[in-house]
Amino acid sequence: MGQIFPRSANPIPRPPRGLATHHWLNFLQAAYRLEPGPSSYDFHQLKTVLKMALETPVWMCPINYSLLASLLPKGYPGQVNEILQVLIQTQTQIPSHPAPPPPSSPTHDPPDSDPQIPPPYVEPTAPQVLPVMHPHGVPPTHRPWQMKDLQAIKQEVSQAAPGSPQFMQTIRLAVQQFDPTAKDLQDLLQYLCSSLVASLHHQQLDSLISEAETRGITGYNPLAGPLRVQANNPQQQGLRREYQQLWLTAFAALPGSAKDPSWASILQGLEEPYHTFVERLNVALDNGLPEGTPKDPILRSLAYSNANKECQKLLQARGHTNSPLGDMLRACQAWTPRDKTKVLVVQPKKPPPNQPCFRCGKAGHWSRDCAQPRPPPGPCPLCQDPTHWKRDCPRLKPAIPEPEPEEDALLLDLPADIPHPKNSIGGEV
């Protein structure tokens, strides 16, 4: 019997180990744009491909979905190829911003590039997270929250600060799948965030709603009541989605955890691989920085300053102290911690004492090295002999009977009154 993969009931499938959360959320965003929608089998196949691709992480620095698609085996089952095509199209649609050329001097030629000076950093063209886009297969009516759905969402954002990229992208995915009303969003906010965060979000949302009502929104009727009331109508899909965008935008004004940078104390261990250390930094910044804060300069700075001394020497020697993250990872890719040889510290042996040993009375050795056995503290309690211990007492040893001589035992088997026959040449027998 083959394994049956139903449609995914969990709003946020678990990411494979070793993949950053914001990268996994990009794959989910692309998967939910497919028509028909993804199933659990598609997510299972996607995780299998990513686990194999993570063994050669050259496509991640920076992330290159075209290179990842080339690693996909031909005729791979599931909708993995379609998911990668959506990511490739989204990546190519974003225009790149080329760096301005350096000013040229007409008098002299530019000097040769110094290998010790790192090249200028070029911003990656790939977006950190994909924007929310509702797929064509959105149901006409929304799905109300269930307790298992709220618990799954809260588990995903438990380690992320409100307003961080991981928090926002997780909420975007939940909004995209369930298409909640204003009442559902309020319930979600109260379930996920504290009362202080909910109060700050409510204030920011009120100001955004007032501005939107003044500006005018497609489908909004001022005579039908406030925008919050009209967004509760399940039939008003367009107006409800406008309210969802305002509700998500209100998180941008929340104070993130960047004031207390716990990620600044993340240091590379003496024997920790460099790519593992960079991945820990990446995850910590995703969970701590507010949305919109540039992460790459902070990540590159910490990837050098918080590395161990051996990796810092490698980066300095190759001029990658402020280079793109991919160059830094390649510089320390072949680094392995040095084998720490254990030095055996031999304690010098003390010279023999001049005093006589208290056991045998001879000089030249310590009492612990004396060949004479230790004398008993008193007489034996069994036989009162002061020359041996109780364990050596002959009374404790069982008496072994002496074996009888073999000749006597043989003689006992012979009869005593049988005459010995006499043989003679002419006589009687």
From Swiss-Prot:
Cross-referenced Pfam families: Gag_p19, Gag_p24, Gag_p24_C, zf-CCHC
GO annotations of cellular component type: viral nucleocapsid
Zinc finger (CCHC-type): 355-372, 378-395
Renumbered ranges of motif PTAP/PSAP motif: 124-127
Record keyword Disulfide bond present: yes
Region of interest (Disordered), ranges: 93-143
Keyword set includes Lipoprotein: yes
Sequence motif PPXY motif, residues: 118-121
Lipid-substituted positions (N-myristoyl glycine): 2
Site feature location: Cleavage: 130-131, 344-345
An annotated GO BP: viral translational frameshifting
Any one GO MF annotation of this record: zinc ion binding
Modified residues (Phosphoserine): 105
Keyword terms: Capsid protein, Disulfide bond, Host-virus interaction, Lipoprotein, Metal-binding, Myristate, Phosphoprotein, Repeat, Ubl conjugation, Viral nucleoprotein, Virion, Zinc, Zinc-finger
Note: HTLV-1 lineages are divided in four clades, A (Cosmopolitan), B (Central African group), C (Melanesian group) and D (New Central African group).
Protein name as catalogued: Gag polyprotein
Biological source species: Human T-cell leukemia virus 1 (isolate Melanesia mel5 subtype C)
Lineage, highest ranks first: Viruses, Riboviria, Pararnavirae, Artverviricota, Revtraviricetes
